[in-house]
Swiss-Prot record:
This is ER membrane protein complex subunit 1. The chain crosses the membrane at residues 953-973. InterPro entries: EMC1, EMC1_C, Quinoprotein_ADH-like_sf, WD40/YVTN_repeat-like_dom_sf. GO terms for biological process: protein insertion into ER membrane by stop-transfer membrane-anchor sequence; tail-anchored membrane protein insertion into ER membrane. The keyword Membrane applies. It holds the Pfam family Beta-prop_EMC1_N. It is a single-pass type I membrane protein. It comes from the Eukaryota.
Length: 983
């Protein structure tokens, strides 16, 4: 029977293709910036449980940093993780603004249970225990508190909180005594303490404590010891202490009595710890007096005592193992100094005030452990580690403590820096692993060609220069060939040397010193800019990070635009990239110029931008060093050129009449066109107003400047040519209705000439809404939207044609276009939502175009543009068959064989970047979101290179056989002719 079953299943088996094992593609998975983390308190533990700002719950391998399991929620505020609690093998999360409560099994990441919570503003959540067991989880909302069973999530009871309109309930506290304390505050009036029974939720006691100085409990207050509330007040420079169970008034303790003082303008924080929810909190707590000043205090029997002062501390943390609780303090190895006002923020402070951050001059840090009972430092517990110079400083600290065999304390530390890098450290300072989690939020990406090798550059140097005479050129060619021979010999020796080793021991390490362009230009440098302000140089064929650079003066939410001013084609001039950083709050901008191959800052000094930048233009004009000219237009419509040499200014003056640009003001609903004057001032040439009370501008999409169009028209069935309308200045403007009612919503699209402001075409999709994804290329526009009437996703494609006669075949000018192009339009039904969309691009534009569509499932669909052709006929004719037009069908099917990433899904995909390679058949693709995925696609198959499975042995054998047969046949023919001649 087993043999029969095996024979039955055998035909269903399928082999994995070679490109599915990472030969031409790779994927890197991330979790994002940490929001919550829990490290198992055992020496042999292997898991780190994390909840991140990217709405991810995951477990990391503490020995390698690899992701053991991961669950990513929606990439919207609805999927945000509000709280994360750990108990044994269960991880409890509250998400979706307090609407969903989940329990995860931490070993394999399985979902134990999920329950929906009542609506209401989420405040906090806490585990609740009885005697010696944790049985419940409590969730506090603005107006109610609910208790749920830890085993199945079922609600035990819910209690509405009194006076919730005026009282801000913000804290929960329970210590296994059968009651839950709910703490609320009426700002600048009093503190309210509710004591509820765990069994039925009945309010046992209500207490009001006068606190006219108290505005909020979050951060400024903490519960220590046997339910004692400790709060800090900057106005009176005091600490206030109140027992939640026995006292009804706050006891004031001036800081002067402890020889302490708050920093001016700093909001202090109280950091308490409760190792177990069935026991009381520790009586010891940290009081943060300034960004770099912490004090370890103890509150015992109503008395405050000062245990130890840490005046140069960057981060602190508590950790418990068994009966021992320790405090970890991260300090600079040398003296800390105040940082300049560069937009950096302190250690996860939630206050809105801008504080002085502390930075370490040599980027060398120490972590030490201290006994919380005495403040005494534990010997042999120092971890020393280094961060990159001019890099980010530590932002969060998590400690994993365990007891060694000799009952001494050992620990590991997880440090997260401002640039979202995770480092896992062990004594005495070994970096076990690190993760660059800022790559989970890539905002800008460019691919740059790698430089030539020395031999290739030597050969290139023979061309384009004045002749050195016949002998000189011969000697130069001879030396170049000798260099190539030497490189080839070294390559053969390496192949022979590696062939003698096991495959697992062969190292093909890629480093920044041996980077060189390959034969088909498939290997490139990927320059990625992340939201944290960190730049990466990644080798495209393997995903190896070759360099990274952190910009300290980039604020969160800043707009980042990356431009390539000079490529590697202009040897010996180094390539040059420019990053425009625009602050979200101040609107001020600055330029950062760097070498994309090595990541080093360029010696070229960019201009100082004194006004907010509205628009940038990368012109085809070059300076004497072959750097493209970048024009920056500020809010006063003044133009700044970079570089601004005399040669550049002269070229700008000559070409000013042909330089146009546009500005978009979405708030006012205006599109304005400007032209450049010879004196580098601007003049408004056109304006299009879109009424903001009816619709709003959501997207303005132009064409890629690097795009090449090979075919100027399409040959129709009657052998005539339908010429494309290839307007490089065409803008596609997408609008959405401001009315959100599903019967009145609409999506509009306007095709506007960016030089003249002429509206080429406009159309409206009624009963439709966004989000709208659009691709604008060649003579076509494809955009996707949601049809509210039919409740489905739809594509609409527009194609522009001049007709059967071309108006001006030599040069295009927007100023000389008397006739509007013909616009063909057709819509299609798509069975899935879309996360991102982009078109393939090749070096010459000969290859067929495909649309790369990122789906919410993480798959990337390669859809031939021929399926979205507005000329597809409903009833096929002889001419349409001659053109190979597919008959029109409104449904666009998703076939699994069109997924370019097979099972390598990209979570929370946000964008797709395409780049041409040296092969016309090949397009390089990078999809980024929570993960990064790189691959190659062949829209028209590989027609210009032999496939990897090409049988060289067979074809060589056939050729040798034919040559041998030819020689024998020739000899036999000669003998035959000779014999015939003798007859």
């Amino acid at each position: 029977m087993a043999a029969g079953l095996w024979a039955l299943l055998l035909p269903l088996a399928a082999a994995v293709y070679e490109d599915q094992v990472g030969k031409f593609d790779w994927r890197q998975q991330y979790v994002g910036k940490l929001k919550f983390a829990s490290l198992e308190a055992a020496q042999g533990s292997k898991k780190l449980l994390v909840g991140t700002e990217k709405n991810v719950v995951a477990a990391l391998n503490s020995r390698s940093g690899e992701i053991l399991w991961r669950h990513a929620d929606k990439a919207t505020p609805e999927g945000a993780i509000d709280a994360m609690l750990i108990h044994g093998q269960d991880a409890i999360t509250v998400s979706s603004a307090g609407r969903i409560l989940r329990s995860w099994e931490t070993n394999i990441g399985g979902l134990n249970w999920e329950t929906s919570l009542d609506t209401g503003s989420f405040q906090t959540a806490s585990l609740v225990g009885l005697q010696d067991a944790v049985k419940y989880v409590a969730v506090l909302k603005k107006a109610a508190i609910s208790l749920h069973y830890l085993s199945n999530g079922h609600q035990k009871w819910v209690e509405h909180l009194p006076e919730s309109e005026n009282t801000q309930y913000q804290m929960l506290y329970s210590r296994g005594a059968g009651v839950i304390h709910v703490l609320g505050v009426v700002p600048q009036s009093h503190l309210k303490v509710l004591t509820l029974s765990v069994e039925d939720g009945e309010v046992i006691e209500q207490t009001k404590v006068a606190a006219p100085w108290l505005k909020s409990l979050n951060g400024a207050c903490g519960v220590v010891g046997e339910a004692v509330l400790v709060c800090a007040d900057t106005a009176t420079h005091s600490l206030y202490v109140c027992s939640l169970e026995t006292e009804q008034e706050m006891k004031q303790i001036p800081l002067q009595s402890l020889d302490l003082e708050f920093a001016d303008g700093f909001q202090p924080r109280v950091l308490a710890t409760q190792p177990s929810v069935i026991n009381a909190s520790r009586t010891q707590f940290f009081l943060q007096l300034s960004p770099g000043h912490f004090s370890l205090l103890q509150c015992k029997q109503g008395l405050l005592s000062h245990l130890r002062d840490f005046q140069q501390a960057a981060l602190v943390s508590f950790a418990t193992t068994g009966e021992k609780t320790v405090a970890a303090v991260l300090t600079c190895r040398n003296e800390l100094k105040p940082a300049s006002s560069d937009g950096l923020h302190g250690n996860a402070l939630e206050d809105s005030q801008k504080q002085e951050a502390l930075t370490c001059s040599n980027q060398t840090y120490n972590i030490n452990l201290y006994l919380v009972e005495t403040g005494q430092r534990l010997l042999d517990t120092t971890i020393t580690f280094n961060l990159e110079q001019n890099g980010a400083k530590p932002e969060q600290l998590y400690i994993q403590v365990f007891l060694k065999k000799d009952d001494s304390v050992g620990y590991r530390a997880l440090v997260q820096t401002e640039d979202h890098m995770l480092m896992f450290l062990q004594q005495p300072g070994k970096v076990v692993w690190s993760r660059e989690e800022s790559l989970a939020e890539v905002v800008s990406l460019e691919m740059v060609d790698l430089p030539l090798t020395g031999a290739q550059a030597e050969l290139e140097g023979e061309f384009g220069k004045k002749a050195d005479g016949l002998l000189g050129m011969f000697l130069k060619r001879l030396s170049s060939q000798l260099i190539l021979l030497q490189a080839w010999t070294a390559h053969l020796w390496k192949m022979f040397y590696d062939a003698r080793k096991p495959r697992s021991q062969i190292k093909n390490e890629i480093n920044i010193d041996n980077l060189a362009r390959d034969e088909f230009n498939l290997q490139k440098m990927m320059v990625m800019v992340t939201a944290s302000g960190k730049l990466f140089g990644i080798e495209s064929s393997s995903g190896t990070i070759l360099w990274k650079q952190y910009l300290r003066n980039v604020r969160p939410g800043a707009s980042l635009k990356l431009m390539v001013q000079r490529t590697t084609a202009h040897f010996p001039h180094p390539p040059q990239c420019t990053l425009l950083v625009k602050d979200k709050e101040t609107k001020m901008s600055f330029l950062y110029v760097f070498n994309p191959i090595f990541g080093k800052r360029s010696q070229v000094a960019p201009p100082v931008l004194k006004r907010p930048v509205l628009q940038t233009l990368l012109l085809p004009i070059m300076d004497q060093d072959y750097a493209k000219v970048l024009l920056l237009i500020d809010d006063e419509y003044k133009v700044t050129a970079f570089p601004a040499t005399k040669n550049v200014l002269r070229q700008l003056e000559e070409m000013a009449h042909s330089i146009f640009f546009y500005l978009v003001d979405a708030e006012q609903g205006k599109l304005s066109g400007f032209r450049l004057k010879k004196d580098l001032t601007t003049e408004e040439s056109w304006q299009v107003a879109i009424p903001t009370e009816v619709q709003r501008i959501v997207t303005v999409k132009g064409k890629r400047s690097s795009e090449h169009v090979h075919s100027q028209g399409r040959v129709m069935g009657d052998r005539s040519v339908l010429y494309k309308s290839l307007n490089p200045n065409l803008l596609a403007v997408v609008t959405e209705s401001t009315d959100t009612h599903h019967e009145r919503t609409f999506v509009g699209i306007y095709l506007i000439d960016g030089v003249t402001g002429r509206i080429i075409h406009s159309s409206v999709q009624k009963k439709a809404k966004g989000p709208v994804h659009i691709v604008h290329s060649e003579n076509w526009v494809v955009y996707q939207y949601w049809n509210t009437k039919a409740r489905r996703n739809e594509f609409t494609v527009l194609e522009l044609y001049e007709g059967t006669e071309q108006y001006n075949a030599t040069a295009f000018s927007s100023l000389d276009r008397p006739l509007l192009p013909q616009v063909l339009q057709q819509s299609y039904i798509f069975p899935s939502a879309i996360s991102a969309m982009e078109a393939t691009i090749t070096e010459r534009g000969i290859t067929s175009r495909h649309l790369l569509i990122g789906l919410p499932s993480g798959a990337i669909l390669s859809l031939p543009k021929a399926l979205l052709d507005p000329r597809r006929p409903e009833i096929p004719t002889e001419q349409s068959r001659e053109e190979n037009l597919i008959p029109y069908s409104p449904d666009v099917q998703i076939h699994a064989e069109r997924f370019i990433n097979y099972n390598q899904t990209v979570s929370q995909i946000r964008g797709i970047y395409t780049s041409p390679s040296g092969l016309e058949s090949t397009c390089l693709v990078v999809a980024y979101g929570l993960d990064i995925y790189q691959t190659r696609v062949y829209p028209s198959k590989q027609f210009d290179v032999l496939k990897d499975d090409y049988d060289y042995v067979l074809i060589s054998s056939v050729l040798f056989g034919l040559v041998f047969a030819t020689m024998i046949t020739k000899r036999l023919a000669q003998v035959k002719l000779l014999n015939r001649a003798w007859r």
